[in-house]
């Protein structure tokens, strides 16, 4: 007996291969990538079965396209003439405004005036790359690369690596490892070190899930509202769904900017925390030994 309910299958986890690019599968064990028949036809096993899929997907193409558009934007509106300090044109002014915002409000404010400029190129790259990928996802027949968990995880991994490098550079390898002990007695290290290491990975995990969930959720709501028109098949539904879908579309444009800003801001905040950890270690490692002789000289002068 047929079910009275309408069943809709949305394969969110399956890769979407773009155009007719050749597929590339790397077997992690012998015979792992051999095609097999399923209820949906012939399929290639996944990573859990020992087959690594390195094929070009639609999200991969979107990342390439975002990078090309970003480079073209910088080439067209970037001020290549060093003698002209004032940008000309609306595009150049908007670009300069965003660059100065990332430098002053994100890098310098969260990392510091001395160390902040060092990380401005990374923060600018993250901000504009995510922004362009988000905006491409709003174009019909395109895909939102930031709605892919693997993409957001890779971006968060970049921030994680930069954050750890910043901490090691500021505190030194010894100071960085000492920070993992939390400054507690050695007999508490077996408890404190795993907690600190877990804390290191919660930050990139939060970056991954925040960007992924926000970009995916908005598009699901948007397509659900439009899908109601075809599911219910009544003209009156369109009068309600279309205005709501348009409102969600405008909201998604705003969210595209906000999520790029939030990711860059949190990246700057995490880098600033690592740099501050190094300065805190230097203060405790150098200021206190110098206080001893000064204190002794003060007592001798008083005597």
UniProtKB/Swiss-Prot annotation:
Protein purpose: Key component of the proton channel; it plays a direct role in the translocation of protons across the membrane.
Protein name: ATP synthase subunit a
Keywords assigned by UniProt, alphabetized: ATP synthesis, Cell inner membrane, Cell membrane, CF(0), Hydrogen ion transport, Ion transport, Membrane, Transmembrane, Transmembrane helix, Transport
Record family assignment: Belongs to the ATPase A chain family.
Any one Gene Ontology cellular component term annotated for this protein: plasma membrane
UniProt key word Plastid: no
Record membrane topology: Multi-pass membrane protein
């Amino acid at each position: 007996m047929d079910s009275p309910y309408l069943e809709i299958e949305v394969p969110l986890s399956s890769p979407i291969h773009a155009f007719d690019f050749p597929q590339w599968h790397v077997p992690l064990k012998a015979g792992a990538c051999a095609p097999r028949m399923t209820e949906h036809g012939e399929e290639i096993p996944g990573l859990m079965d020992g087959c690594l899929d390195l094929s070009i997907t639609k999200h991969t193409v979107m990342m390439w396209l975002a990078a090309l558009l970003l480079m073209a934007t910088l080439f067209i509106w970037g001020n290549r003439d060093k003698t002209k300090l004032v940008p000309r044109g609306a595009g150049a002014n908007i670009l300069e405004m965003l660059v100065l915002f990332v430098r002053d409000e994100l890098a310098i404010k969260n990392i510091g005036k001395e160390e902040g400029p060092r990380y401005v190129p990374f923060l600018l790259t993250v901000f504009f790359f995510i922004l362009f990928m988000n905006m491409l996802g709003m174009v019909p027949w395109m895909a939102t690369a930031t709605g892919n968990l693997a993409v957001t995880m890779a971006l968060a991994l970049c921030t994680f690596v930069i954050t750890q490098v910043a901490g090691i550079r500021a505190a030194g390898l010894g100071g960085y490892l000492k920070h993992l002990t939390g400054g507690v007695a050695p007999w508490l290290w077996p408890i404190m070190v795993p907690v600190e290491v877990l804390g290191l990975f919660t930050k990139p995990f939060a970056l991954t899930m925040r960007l992924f969930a926000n970009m995916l959720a908005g598009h699901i709501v948007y397509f659900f509202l439009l899908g109601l028109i075809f599911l219910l098949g009544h003209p009156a539904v369109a009068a309600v769904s279309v205005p709501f879908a348009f409102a969600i579309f405008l909201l998604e444009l705003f969210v595209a900017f906000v999520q790029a800003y939030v990711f860059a801001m949190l990246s700057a905040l995490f880098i600033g925390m690592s740099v501050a950890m190094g300065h805190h270690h230097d203060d405790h490692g150098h200021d206190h030994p110098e206080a001893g002789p000064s204190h002794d000289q003060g007592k001798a002068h008083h005597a």
